[in-house]
Amino acid sequence: MSSFRKKNAKFWAEVFDLLVFLILVFWIVLFIRLFIATPYTVIWSSMAPNFHQKDWIIVEKITQRFGTFERGDVIVFVAPWKTSPYIKRIIWLPWETVLFQDWGVYICSDNIPAWSLIKDSDWNNCELLPEPYLLEWLKTNAVCGKEEFKVKSGYFVMWDNRWRTTDSLCCFGIQCYDWANYVVPDNYLIGKVRVRLYPTYTKF
């Protein structure tokens, strides 16, 4: 009887240890996913040729809270009028003015007064944005009836597949009411894509 009680006590002690371990693992994983990094699956072909449908990616969340996003960063966010996460690339930053011209993106200084009538001399203040991540036939053209933008706050983001139109260029597929509809506010950002796990391991 004594031996049975010892075995029974040992069994329940092991069960308790296992439960404690599982609870600890659960909270560690939850903390990591909420505050450090979380996995996502790419569901669209809009970031081709750099990301494809069913790619597994890891999104780092620390930059969103403590760091700074840079031009060219690939981010995951929830669009202001959508519920599912998007993956897109930051093209320009707060308080920048940009121009779409000749299938290119130009970053221009703020001292150009009239964006609707850009003169030849004004091009001295504009710089063509190099985009080595794009295929030649996916270069940018102005769509949705607008060729110039002033980003007051938030981030202007675009697909790498520029033939898709549900990005900042077209207010994520809804009607554009003012400049705020074109950008992603800070509080909608989830994080920066750091790693692709599948089908090929790639760091960004």
Q: In which residue ranges do the predicted regions lie?
A:
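A short acidic/basic microdomain associated with nuclease active sites
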Residues: W44
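Soluble "head" domains of membrane/secretory-pathway proteins
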Residues: S2-F16, V20, F35, T41, ...
